[in-house]
Each structure stands twice: as C-alpha cells, then as structure tokens.
Regions:
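Flexible, surface-exposed loop regions and adjacent strand-edge segments
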Residues: 803-808
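Short acidic/polar inter-strand loop motif in beta-rich domains
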Residues: 680-687, 790-799
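Membrane-proximal, cysteine-centered motifs at transmembrane boundaries in secretory-pathway
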Residues: 748-756, 763-776, 795-797
Length: 841
C-alpha cells in the first residue's frame, strides 16, 4: 500500500519528517509525493526541491521508499503548463474540417487553451523530461543512486480537452501532430486529407482506424518510450496510468492504442477511482472490467507486477470492507501495488477540488490510528496477485480498430463491439480473461474476437455470431475446472471472482455487497461448504480444509446491558448558509463550553465545473463553465456581534485544523441563533464548510441540546443525537463473561472499524466481516470491563448535502450505501465443543 501524499501549503521540515514517521508507524513502507492544488510553493522551484530532499532523506533514514509524481495535478506532460506555453508547436492542436458552399472542404487548425501539451510531439516530451525528470535526477541524485526512489508516476498524459475553432464547430476535428500526413501516406499509400474528405462525403473507408492506430504508435514512441528510456537509464520504474481505460471508444480517441501504450511502462498502471464493488445489474458505479483487463495484459507482458491508483473520488464514508474489496479486485488481475488516495498535508486543495473526497487518509478517524489494517491486507493481496493463473483462462482480442473507427465516425444507430459485456460475463462466472492485441498470437485454449452488433467469434472452433451467453457456455464446455464454487443447490455461483493458481491454491471474491453467501467449494470432486461474507474474500490453500467455524451452542445478546458512551472529540454541527450568506442554529436548552470554529483558509482560484484548475487569467474553451474567486478573508457575525476566533483550531480533524480558527469556550443560550458571513465567499463548498459549532451536545431533528450523561443501550450514533459526530465512540460496561470452553464476541457496527478491549487487554481491531473476537480462556466466568470503540469516517462533519447549494458537481455519490454507524448489536457466541473456532477471511 502506497499513500498518495498530496503536498499542500508550505510544509516545514519538521512537518515533513513527522508525516513520514506517521506513515511508517502504520507499517507502510513507501509513499508517493504529489504536487496538488493548494501547494503554496513554486512547483519545481527551490523550496519544492528542498521539500523533496527532506522527504527522501527521512525515508532513507527509516529504510522506506519514495515514488515521485511527474506533474503538478494532472494530466502529465506540461510541467505545470510550462512546456506548451514555451512553444506553440508543443501545444495540443486539432485539425478542423468544414464544408464550403460549393460542396468542397476547407481545412483549418486550432490550438487548445494554454497549458495543454501535445504528447505526440517528441520535442515537447523531451522538454518535459528536461524540466522535470532531469531536475529531480540532479537534485535527488543520492536517493536515485541508493534506490530510495523506486519510480516515477505519470498521470493521464493523453487527457482530452476542448478546442475552440473561431469558425464554429467543424464537421470533424481530431488531434494534429507533426509528420501525421507523412505517416498516413507511408502506411496506406493514400493522402490523409483525401480519405477524410471521402469519409465525410460517403461515410466509407478505414481512415479513422488507420489514423488512431498511427496516433497510438506515435504516442507510445514520443511519450512512453522516451520516459521509459529515461527511467531505465536512471534505475527506476516508470508507472502510472492512461485516461479512459474503461471505455474502448474514449481510450481510442485519447490513447490511440491503449494496449500498445500501456506496455510501454515498466510497472504498468491503472486507476479505479470510482471504487466500484457491486456486480449486480444496474449498480453504479459499474465495475471497470475493461480497465482491469487492459492493466492485466500489460502486467503479464512485462512480468513484474502492476500498480493501481485507488479510491480518489469517494464517497468519503466508504467502509474499510469496500476499500479491501477493490484492492482484491486489483489483485485478482495481477496488480500488486496499491496507491491509496488520499493522504494530505492539509485539506486546502479542496478550495479548487471540491467535487469529491477520498475515503482513505489520516483525516478519517478509522484510518488515522488503524491504517495498518489495510496495509497488512495489501501485503496479502499483493502476494496473491503475483501468482500464476492455472486454469479456465481465455484470450479476448481487444477490438482497437473497430473502436477507433466508431470513436471518430460515431455510433448512432450502431451496436459496436461489446468487450465490456464479454469480460463481465466470463469473469463473473469464474473464468479469467487475458486481453491480446488484434494480431497477437496466443496459446490459450479459446480465443474470442469482438464483432459488430455485440456478437463474438471464437477462433479455435470457428464459431461466429456468439452472444456473451453463448461464449460462456462454450467456455464451460471446453474448460473443466479442478476448483469451482457452487450454490447450495449445486449450480455454478455467479457475481464473484474465482482464481485457481499453479501452486494449487484458489481465491474467491464476493461482488455481492450486502449478502453473506452460503456456498460450496468443489475441488477435484470433493465439496466443502463455506460462508463468503459480503464484499469478502476467501483464500483456499492447496490442501482442502473446513472453512466454517462450528455453530455456537448458544448465543447471548448484550442488548440489555447499560453502557457508558464516551467520545474522542467534541461533537460538531455545521452551520448551513443560504445564498445571502445567512444561517441559523436552534438550541433547545443552554449549552456550556461550546466553541465556534471558523474557516481561515481563503485562496484565489479559477476552476472548471468539472474540477480542472486553470490560470486566473486563462480563457477557457467554449463550453467550459468556470468558477472564479479572488480570495477574501472570512469574517462572521453571530446574533449581530462579530465572531472573534483567537485560538488555533483543535476541534476538527488533522488536515482540517490548520485551516480553521476557534473561539474561546462560551455558553450558548436557548433559542434561535443567527449567523452571517460578513466577508468571504459563500458557503458553497460541501467539503470545506465555513463555520461549525463544536462542543458536548446532541442534535435531534436539527435542534441542539445538551448531551445526556446517563447510561445508553445499543444503537446507532444518531439515536443519541450524534449523527454528525466525527471520531471514535466507545461503549464501555462491566459484563459477565460466559463460563464456557470457548467464547467469541460478535458485533454489528455498520461495517465501521472497531476495536475491543476486555479487562484492559486489547483484543484487536476488525475492519470487515467477521466482526468477531476470541475471548481469552482465563476470563471465562469472570466480570470484566468491556470497551468497544467504533471509529467513523470524516464524512459526518460535513452534514447533509441536501441542506445547501454547492457550486461544483459531485464526481461520485456523496455518501456510501452502508447503514448507520454505531454499536448496533453485540452477542456472546458460546462454544462448548473442543474444536477450535476458525477465522473466516
């Protein structure tokens, strides 16, 4: 697991070294340094390079490793806009073709907005390397040579942008680069312009598949090959990912030939930033079968593992089981390095990027103290990712020529190749797919090709016009399995991934998110029942073994226990403001020792509605909506009086506290209190609120009142007025431990990370099912203090997204699908038998 470490503000040397120490204490061995929105140092300037020295030096001192990132934000290739702004010949440009009144055609070209580079121009890429890679190599030479620096990450270098043509929208537009027409003539013996005009007149010809094939070859040689050669020469890995990996049409337009391009990296990468884990029909976001398999083919081609960027787009309150599931999806496709989004120095990057919030990082209470749980799981997943699939693997040809033609020609009224549908059907039914290029040889037993109309051909048998269901039936007929998973009625199980490896082991991953499944593992005819938790993984060694714990002899609920409920932090309540910058809070009874927490982070910015930062004076492409703001310090009033915030903030979360100030504690009377933003932008940033109230209070139906200090029962935090609480809540009580041979404690906490202590002993942490703990035998029959600590994400403190109006669209759902957080159920599982209780993965 590799934290994606976003550098914001102006970190001091002490802060840098403390950050590295905090990463290592979680058992994490490396991190990636990422220059992100909110960085207040000159990118690639002296202070930035000195900061990188501090990171590398501290990593070396601790025996850790560092990954570099080759850009400010993304896409890669510009050195924060310097490359294209130095030379218009290096700027992204497109041809545009128009029809004249007489029916002839007119060609023109136009440049993209400033800052967008043409990655198909070798000289532009060479300049990018000179400004970025060479500067790092000179400044960080020691850490290149002693292998502290492992590699450099390149991010979406083929990213598209809108190009505005002065004459209006052309009939067709496409990327222009030097030498294109000569390359086309050499490949076809024809003229590019003649073939484009023929296509415009007749809609006939292969001009677009040829053009995008050539563009892919140029992209590979100009960009990936130059970067790879530089990395090879300096003894580090080239990794990263392309744009539009999930869509064959978008990938063709942006990358030309994604199979060819990704094979240019020494550690091929992918991203899965939507965090999809649900294979049921209609689920959104949908699992990216094409992305995974494009990455897998490149991993197999290179033979040294792969890398995935994960989780970036949230939702922020995804439970750890979801993050684990996506990590294992990567492992099932040969990916063994997991970039975990997002660890930040502070959250000021949200000023520009406030359309999404990642579910990992120390801003989340569960992650801050227990990221090691996910890091430990990453090591297990990586070990399994490096295994070799032994059976039920089929080849599928990537339909690049068809995708390229349709990407440019349009797909209205046409059903194109359904690569996604075939991969999904085969993978969810216990087969493994290996993508191969259109003309590549393979020794796999079945080879499928995608046809128009969403049909398929199989090359070994000569069968054509197959549906995805036909292809599945053919695989089942031709490819027997030594290991498979069945439903209890004996039919093959679906909506899961299954792999069997050459060492005789097998792995099963549940892609049904809410249902534990009672299944049967069949190995060489021997059947073994097992329980597969929702979103869970089950690992089978080469030797068959019982996979279920014995059924408890009795179950005793702790529902009648009276608990003390303590909180690790104050409760907080966002003040929601309307369009006029006014808001209210209603208090039912006086509150003691509360504080107002005021935003102190004001930054100038200009950003498109999709989240792309642009220069404050940059003119956007036609059709881009731009949000512009010039920084104005915040000031607030409460009930007509100015709010004074003399203290540094200690009431929120790490990464948020540095961006806020707080008042001294005060008493808040009962009644309605009115708040106003008298200076500063409107409160339209969901993830960076303007004003909070913090203290020991509860909230019921939007009304605040003192929190009860009495005993509580089991229940969600919202039942106690703590729906917005962000931190760790601990239920504690003296309990009688059952006097049985073996006892296990089972909890339901809404899937949140949970720690249990009994009689002062730490029994450990659980972050996914089963939420069960073995009770020490010497405590049987005794009374002891039971402490159950449940940790939230950061999401609760943002409040209800329906309560405000936000100026940027959310890239993903704001909130995850899991239920309420709390201590929802607790049971003793008593087992009198001598057989040991076995852990279910």
């Amino acid at each position: 697991m590799i934290p994606f470490l976003a550098i914001t503000g102006r970190p001091t040397e002490a802060e840098v070294r403390a950050k590295v120490a905090a990463i290592q204490v979680q058992g994490i061995e490396s991190f990636l340094i990422y220059a992100r929105s909110g960085l207040e140092l000159e990118y690639m300037g002296e202070a930035w390079l000195k900061l990188n020295e501090w990171f590398c030096d501290e990593a070396e001192r601790r025996g850790m490793k560092v990954w570099l990132y080759d850009e400010y934000n993304w896409p890669s290739g510009t050195c924060k806009g310097r490359v294209p702004n130095e030379n218009d010949a290096w700027r992204y440009a497109e041809y545009g073709v128009y029809r004249n009144p007489d029916g002839s055609f007119r060609w023109t070209s136009a440049l993209a907005p400033a800052g967008w580079v043409n990655v198909c121009e070798p000289a532009a890429v060479a300049r990018f390397i000179e400004l970025t890679h060479e500067v790092y190599a000179k400044r960080l030479d020691r850490w290149f040579k002693n292998k502290t620096i492992l590699g450099i990450f390149t991010d979406e270098p083929g990213h598209p942008t809108r190009v505005t043509f002065p004459e209006g929208k052309p009939l067709v537009s496409f990327r222009k680069y030097a030498g294109l027409e000569d390359e086309y003539r050499a490949a076809t013996g024809r003229e590019l312009k003649t073939d484009v005009e023929k296509w415009l007149a007749t809609k006939e010809g292969d001009v677009w598949s040829v053009y995008l094939g050539l563009m892919g070859t140029r992209f590979r040689s100009a960009y990936f090959d130059q970067l790879r050669a530089w990395c090879d020469a300096h003894g580090i890995l080239l990794t990263g990912h392309m744009i539009s990996e999930n869509d064959i049409y978008g990938s063709a337009r942006c990358n030309g030939n994604p199979i060819l391009c990704l094979r240019g990296e020494s550690l091929p990468g992918m991203d899965e930033i939507g965090t999809a884990y649900d294979a049921t029909p209609g689920a959104r976001p949908a699992i990216e079968w094409v992305t995974y398999n494009v990455a897998r083919q490149a991993v197999l081609h290179r033979g040294h593992g792969g890398l995935a960027e994960l989780y970036a787009c949230g939702p922020a309150n995804h439970v750890p089981a979801t993050l684990r599931n996506v990590m294992w999806q990567c492992a099932f496709h040969g990916i063994d390095h997991y970039i975990t989004c997002m660890d930040v120095m502070d959250e000021r990057g949200l000023v520009e990027k406030h359309g999404y919030f990642a579910p990992a990082g120390p801003v989340h209470p569960w992650y801050e103290k227990h990221a090691h749980v996910l890091a430990d799981e990453a090591r297990v997943a990586a070990a399994w990712a490096r295994k070799t699939v032994a059976e039920r693997e089929v080849a599928v040809r990537y339909p690049n020529r068809l995708a390229a033609q349709l990407a440019m020609a349009g797909r209205k009224g046409v059903t194109g190749p359904d690569l996604y549908g075939l991969l999904k059907t085969l993978e969810l039914n216990q087969f493994t797919c290996r993508l191969v290029d259109e003309d590549e040889s393979t020794d796999l037993p079945l080879v499928f090709a995608c046809l128009m109309g969403g049909r398929f051909a199989e090359e070994r048998t000569g069968k054509r016009a197959l549906t995805a269901a036909d292809a599945l039936a053919l695989c089942r007929d031709r490819l027997p399995a030594t290991f498979r998973v069945l439903e209890q009625n004996g039919t093959p199980a679906t909506n899961l991934l299954v792999r069997t490896y050459t060492d005789g082991s097998s792995a099963v991953l549940n892609l049904q998110p809410f249902s534990d499944r009672m299944l049967v593992a069949e190995r060489n005819g021997t059947r073994t029942p097992f329980t597969l938790p929702a979103r869970g993984v089950m690992l089978f060694d080469a030797v068959a073994q019982e996979r279920n714990p014995p059924v408890p002899s009795s179950i005793t609920s702790l529902a009648n226990v009276d608990w003390d409920l303590t909180l690790s932090a104050p409760n907080i309540r966002r003040v929601n403001f309307d369009e006029t910058k006014n808001g209210t809070l209603t208090v039912a009874a006086p509150l003691k020792d509360v504080r107002l927490v005021t935003r102190d982070c004001a930054m100038s910015y200009a950003v498109t509605s999709s989240g792309r930062p642009i220069g404050l004076n940059e003119q956007p492409a036609k059709g881009d909506t731009v949000i512009r703001h010039v920084a104005e310090p915040y000031a607030f009033e409460m009930d007509g009086a100015k709010v004074e915030s003399p203290e540094p903030c200690t009431s929120l979360r790490p990464c948020y506290d540095p961006l806020y100030r707080q008042t001294v504690p005060f008493a808040l009377a009962a009644g309605e209190h009115r708040f106003a933003i008298t200076s500063g932008e409107a409160d339209k940033n969901f993830f960076l609120p303007a004003l909070f109230l913090a203290g020991d209070f509860a909230v019921f139906n939007d009304v605040l009142m003192p929190r009860s200090t009495g005993k509580v029962k089991l229940g969600p935090l919202a039942m106690f007025g703590l729906a917005d609480f962000t931190g760790t809540a601990t239920w504690s009580a003296e309990v009688a431990v059952p006097n049985t041979a073996r006892t296990r404690l089972r909890l339901a906490t809404g899937g949140r990370l949970t720690q249990v202590k009994l009689a002062g002993r730490d029994l450990g942490v659980r972050a996914w099912a089963p939420f069960e703990w073995d009770i020490p035998a010497d405590l049987a029959g005794k009374k002891a203090l039971l402490e159950i600590s449940v940790s939230t994400s950061v999401q609760p403190m943002f409040g209800d997204p329906a309560a405000g109006t936000w100026d940027m669209r959310f890239w993903n759902a704001v909130s995850g699908p899991d239920g309420p957080c709390g201590l929802l159920a607790a049971d003793w599982l008593e087992q009198a038998a001598s057989a040991p209780l076995k852990e279910i993965w």
